[in-house]
Amino acid sequence: MIRFTAAVVALAAALALASSVAAQTPAAGDIGLGKRLYQDKATCGFCHGWSGDGAGDPQSPGKAANLRESKLDHDQLIEIIRCGVPGGTAMPHFDKFAWTKGEECFGMTEADVGDKKPPNPTAGLQKREIEAIAAYIEAKIVGKGPPTVADCEEYFGSGSQRCKEMAAGRKE
């Protein structure tokens, strides 16, 4: 009976650990949704570039953070997507309730930051969408080194003209 009880306790502990790890690992669907949101709704690539290297779209000033070299942890990344970056940067806040009472950002409200509040986004995001973008950035961009042709094809699709030019050594 003692062995059975010990086995049940060990199994319960293993299942708890496995579910904890699974909860921290983004699902493939979350990453796919995050990619679509990064590309289309949030238009992150306009400033951060398709590869997240901070180069931006050809029409952007290219002054955004290089996400490939980011040292932000998950919670910090979520807060920046949700709240933007105060202080006159172009990084918008994607949570429409950010900076309000009860939804403080970086421990501050809109009254605390005044005219240094981040700009409004072109489209707001829901919590699930913010989580999905963070999952995509963490899975496909952060710590991945310089962008490759394979990265380009994963982002734009196989046969993309941009990726063909990248493969030929031309500027993106």
Predicted segments — roles?
Residues A7-A18:
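Bacterial N-terminal signal peptides
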Residues M1-F4:
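Positively charged n-region of N-terminal signal peptides that target proteins for export
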Residues A28-W50, C83:
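Sequence/structural segment immediately N-terminal to covalent heme-attachment motifs in c-type
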Residues S19-A23:
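Sec/Tat signal peptide C-region and signal peptidase I cleavage site
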Residues P26-G32, K41-A42, T89-E172:
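Flexible coil segments in periplasmic/lumen-exposed cytochrome c-class electron-transfer proteins
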Residues S51-P86, A90-D115, P119:
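Gly/Gly-Pro-rich "capping" loops immediately C-terminal to redox-active cysteine motifs
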